[in-house]
Amino acid sequence: MNKLTTIESHFLQQQKLYPEINSEVTGLLNDVAFAAKLVRREVVRAGLADILGLAGSTNVQGEEVKKLDLFANERLINAIGQHGRFAIMGSEENEETITPPKFESGEYVLLFDPLDGSSNIDVNVSVGTIFSIYRLKSDNPSQASIEDCLQKGADQVAAGYVIYGSSVMLVYTTGHGVHGFTFDQTVGEFLLSHENITTPEHGKYYSVNEGSWNEFHDGTKLFLDYLKEEDKATGRPYSTRYIGSFVADFHRNLLTGGVFIYPATKKHKNGKLRLMYEANPMAFICEQAGGRATDGHRRILDIEPVELHQRTPLYIGSKNDVLIAEEFEQDKR
């Protein structure tokens, strides 16, 4: 693999290999990569730029908004919307859909979480941006509406995430494998570092907030107990790895193998993660890498959304681990 393959060169290569990845799609992805550079610049200097801490408001989810959340949200909307490729957008931070600048020529829909895990930014823990791209269903971009956003995850054109950690990586899929790029600040470019990522069928880690144990249903508790039992034949016990930043936990498990779960609980019967902004894009990536993603009963990508900020339980990661989790959730074990 050529370590000096820029993300733009890679997109052009993909465009030649797969006719459905046209210049518009590669343009969309380049826009996202550019926006990620802007967010990355502020994330790495957040402590010096007075954008740490709370902004004094709450978002549509009822969560306190961090200053950096607002910055990332604004930068993504402005940087990605300026080229007229998107007719409509949806952000985890905005209650309503967003009409971007130059929307009149847009043929696509963008849904994104501008800064996932931002509650960790004040203590220098990895955070990330998650994005999802769909084709516009409306014939006329000026008529784009929330209905264009409410599409199944299986209809995604592309999805990806950017993780801002010890290095900055952009990972994406268009349905033709999963590829990762590491940002080289000396040249200011994302360079191909992880080509055709595949995730192990069996993992060795599980990621869950066990502080919610008393809120878990019996199936979830039994699955976690199963992972902790010693059985050399199945590689158990698993080790716990939980950062509390979904992008960071997912990224580690994608590369090393494992399962991330955010189940339904007695307090949150529909789960807590957002279907459109978090579960769908990560499920697309996970499946393309050979993994599996469900809500415990259904494939995530098959769920018909009814709300822009719809929530869902999530079991995602190594295929066999998720299958076992489903068996416990469905009382088959």
UniProtKB/Swiss-Prot annotation:
Binding residue positions for Mg(2+) 1: 92, 113, 115
Binding annotation for substrate: 116-119, 209, 242, 272
Gene Ontology BP, a term: sucrose biosynthetic process
UniProt KW Metal-binding keyword: yes
Cofactor binding notes: Binds 2 magnesium ions per subunit.
GO molecular function: fructose 1,6-bisphosphate 1-phosphatase activity; magnesium ion binding
Enzymatic reactions: beta-D-fructose 1,6-bisphosphate + H2O = beta-D-fructose 6-phosphate + phosphate
Keywords: Calvin cycle, Carbohydrate metabolism, Cytoplasm, Hydrolase, Magnesium, Metal-binding
Pathway: Carbohydrate biosynthesis; Calvin cycle
Keyword Cytoplasm: yes
Top-rank taxon, per record: Bacteria
CC annotations in GO: cytosol
Localization, UniProt: Cytoplasm
Pfam family, one: FBPase
Cofactor(s) the protein needs: Mg(2+)
InterPro entries reported in the protein's UniProt record: FBPase_C_dom, FBPase_class-1, FBPase_N, FBPtase
Residue positions binding Mg(2+) 2: 113, 116, 278
Family: Belongs to the FBPase class 1 family.
Assembly: Homotetramer.
Protein's name in the database: Fructose-1,6-bisphosphatase class 1
Lineage: Bacteria, Pseudomonadati, Chlorobiota, Chlorobiia, Chlorobiales
Gene coding for it: fbp
